C-alpha cells in the first residue's frame, strides 16, 4: 500500500510538472536604441550579431515591425500596458527620480501572465518611474515593478546616463551603506559635489550636450547625486551583472512557467562595454556595445540549453525605438560609422516621426514550435500583450490598443493590425498599408543629436514600399489617400494631438 501511495504521489507530481510545462516560458529581450540596420540578420555587414541572428534565422524575422514611439519611456509603457502612450500624459522621457507612470490598478502584461499561472520577473533597464515622487532611496522604493505585476525585479531606475547610478532589487538599492545615504536632485547640485562643468579634469568621457551634472566613474550624467558610493555600479560591469541575474532567475524557475522581461542597456549612452569587448568592431564604443548586447543574448540562450528548457521557451527580441549616434557624449559614433546605416536605410532615427524612429528589429523564436520565416506582416510591440494572452489562456480587458495577432507572431497567418498611430515627442503620424502620413509640425528639422525629427511645413505622404527612405512626398499625387489617412488619424486621436 505504501509503495502504491508513493507511486500515486509520483504520478501526481509528474502530472503537475507536465501541466506546468505545457505553457512555454516567455522571455522578452528589449534592446535600447538598437536600430533595424544594426543587426546582421537584416543585412548589416559592419557589425556581426550571431546570437541575435540565431533567433532571427530560427524563428519569425519581422521586416515590418514597429514600436509605438520613437523614445524609450512611451515605447515601454505601450509594451507593458497594450495602450497607446500618447493617451497617458506622463508617458514621456522620464528623469531618474520620476514617479511610476503605470497605475497600480492598471492592467499590465506581467499581471496577465501572473494570473495565467506564470512567475514574473523584470531585469535590466526600467525607465517607467518608481515611487510616488520625492523618493527616499534609502528605504524600499514603491510602487514599482513589483506593484504592477512582477514577482521579482532587479533594475536600473531610468537609463545608464541618469542618476541614481545604482541597482534596485525588489525596491531596495543593492549594496547600500545606510551610513552613506543616497540623495538625488534633478534641479540643483549638492554642496561640494563635483560636476562635469566645474570639474572637467575628473572626466574620462567628454560630454556633448545635456550630460554635464554629477560625475560617476569619470562619466558625466544627467541629474545630481550624492552618497551611495558603495552601491554605485561600474558601467563596464553592467552587462555581466544583469546576465548573472538572468541566469539565476532562469535556474530558480526552470521547473515552472515563467515570464521574464530583460531590458538590455545597450547601445544606449554612455557606451562603456566591458573591456573584453573593446575594439570588437571598427565603429568605436557603439559598435562594441552592440557586440556586448549580442553576447548577452548568447548567454541567455546557452543557459536555457544548460537548464534543458530552450525547447519550452519563447524568446522575443526587439528594441524600444530607433537608433541614434550622437546622444550626449563624444564617443566617435558619428566619426566611425562609415557606410553602416543603423536605421537600415530608413530616414530619421530615435526621436523622429520618420520611419527610422519606430521601425525596429523584432524576432520571435521558439525552438521546435515556430518554423523559420522571413515575414512582411505588419505588427506592433503592444500587440504582444493580447497575443500572448491568447497563447497562455490569459484574460484581457476590452479597449486595449494592442491587437491580438498571435498567428502572425507564430508565423502561421496574416496580421490583424491594419494601422498604427506612431508617436515621437508627443507628435503623431499615421501608418497603414504601404503608407505613412506625417502632419505638419512646427519645430527644428533636426535636434541636437543630428537626427531628423519629421517636423515638416506641409502634410507629407510616403509610400514605404516604393520609397523606404522617404525621399519623395507624394501627397499631391494621391490626395484621396491623404484625406483618408487624415480622417482616420483624427478619428483615432479625437483630433486632440494633431498639429501640436
Kindly give the residue locations of the regions a language model identified.
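Hydrophobic h-region of N-terminal signal peptides that target proteins for export
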Residues: 10-19
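Cysteine-centered catalytic environments shared across enzyme families
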Residues: 5, 9
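Formylglycine-dependent sulfatase
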Residues: 2-4, 19-460, 468-500
Amino acid at each position: 500500500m505504501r509503495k502504491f501511495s508513493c507511486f500515486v504521489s509520483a504520478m501526481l507530481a509528474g502530472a503537475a510538472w507536465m501541466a506546468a510545462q505545457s505553457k512555454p516560458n516567455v522571455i522578452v529581450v528589449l534592446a535600447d536604441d538598437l536600430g533595424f540596420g544594426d543587426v546582421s540578420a537584416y543585412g548589416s555587414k559592419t557589425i556581426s550579431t550571431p546570437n541575435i541572428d540565431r533567433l532571427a534565422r530560427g524563428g519569425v524575422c519581422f521586416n515590418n515591425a514597429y514600436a509605438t514611439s520613437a523614445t524609450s519611456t512611451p515605447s515601454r509603457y505601450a509594451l507593458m500596458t497594450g495602450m497607446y502612450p500618447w493617451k497617458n500624459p506622463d508617458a514621456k522621457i522620464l528623469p531618474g527620480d520620476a514617479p511610476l507612470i503605470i497605475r497600480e490598478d492598471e492592467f499590465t502584461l506581467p499581471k496577465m501572465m501572473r494570473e495565467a499561472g506564470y512567475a514574473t520577473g523584470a531585469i535590466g533597464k526600467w525607465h517607467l518611474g518608481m515611487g510616488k515622487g520625492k523618493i527616499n532611496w534609502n528605504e524600499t522604493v514603491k510602487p514599482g515593478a513589483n506593484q504592477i505585476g512582477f514577482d521579482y525585479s532587479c533594475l536600473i531606475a531610468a537609463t545608464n546616463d541618469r542618476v541614481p547610478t545604482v541597482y534596485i532589487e525588489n525596491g531596495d538599492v543593492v549594496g547600500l551603506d545606510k551610513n552613506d545615504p543616497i540623495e538625488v536632485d534633478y534641479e540643483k547640485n549638492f554642496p561640494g559635489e563635483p560636476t562635469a562643468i566645474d570639474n572637467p579634469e575628473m572626466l574620462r568621457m567628454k560630454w556633448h550636450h545635456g550630460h554635464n551634472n554629477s560625475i560617476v566613474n569619470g562619466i558625466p550624467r544627467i541629474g545630481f547625486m550624492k552618497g551611495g558610493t558603495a552601491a554605485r555600479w561600474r558601467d563596464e560591469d553592467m552587462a555581466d551583472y544583469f546576465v548573472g541575474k538572468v541566469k539565476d532567475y532562469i535556474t530558480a524557475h526552470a521547473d515552472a512557467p515563467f515570464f521574464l522581461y530583460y531590458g538590455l542597456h545597450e547601445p544606449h549612452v554612455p557606451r562603456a562595454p566591458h573591456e573584453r569587448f573593446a575594439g570588437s568592431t571598427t565603429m568605436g564604443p557603439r559598435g562594441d556595445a552592440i557586440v556586448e548586447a549580442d553576447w548577452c543574448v548568447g548567454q541567455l540562450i546557452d543557459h536555457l540549453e544548460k537548464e534543458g528548457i530552450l525547447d519550452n521557451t519563447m524568446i522575443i527580441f526587439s528594441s524600444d525605438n530607433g537608433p541614434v549616434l550622437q546622444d550626449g557624449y563624444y564617443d566617435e559614433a558619428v566619426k566611425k560609422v562609415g557606410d553602416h546605416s543603423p536605421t537600415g536605410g530608413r530616414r530619421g532615427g530615435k526621436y523622429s516621426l520618420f520611419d527610422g524612429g519606430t521601425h525596429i528589429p523584432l524576432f520571435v523564436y521558439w525552438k521546435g514550435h515556430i518554423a523559420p520565416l522571413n515575414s512582411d506582416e505588419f505588427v506592433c510591440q503592444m500587440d504582444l500583450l493580447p497575443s500572448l494572452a491568447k497563447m497562455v489562456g490569459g484574460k484581457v480587458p476590452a479597449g486595449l490598443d494592442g491587437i491580438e495577432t498571435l498567428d502572425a507572431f507564430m508565423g502561421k497567418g496574416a496580421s490583424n493590425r491594419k494601422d498604427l498611430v506612431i508617436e515621437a515627442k508627443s507628435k503623431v503620424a499615421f501608418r497603414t498599408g504601404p503608407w505613412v502620413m506625417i502632419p505638419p509640425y512646427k519645430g527644428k528639422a533636426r535636434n541636437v543629436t543630428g537626427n531628423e525629427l519629421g517636423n515638416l511645413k506641409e502634410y507629407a505622404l510616403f509610400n514605404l514600399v516604393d520609397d523606404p527612405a522617404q525621399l519623395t512626398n507624394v501627397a499631391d499625387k494621391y490626395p484621396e489617400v491623404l484625406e483618408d489617412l487624415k480622417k482616420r488619424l483624427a478619428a483615432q486621436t479625437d483630433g486632440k494631438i494633431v498639429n501640436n
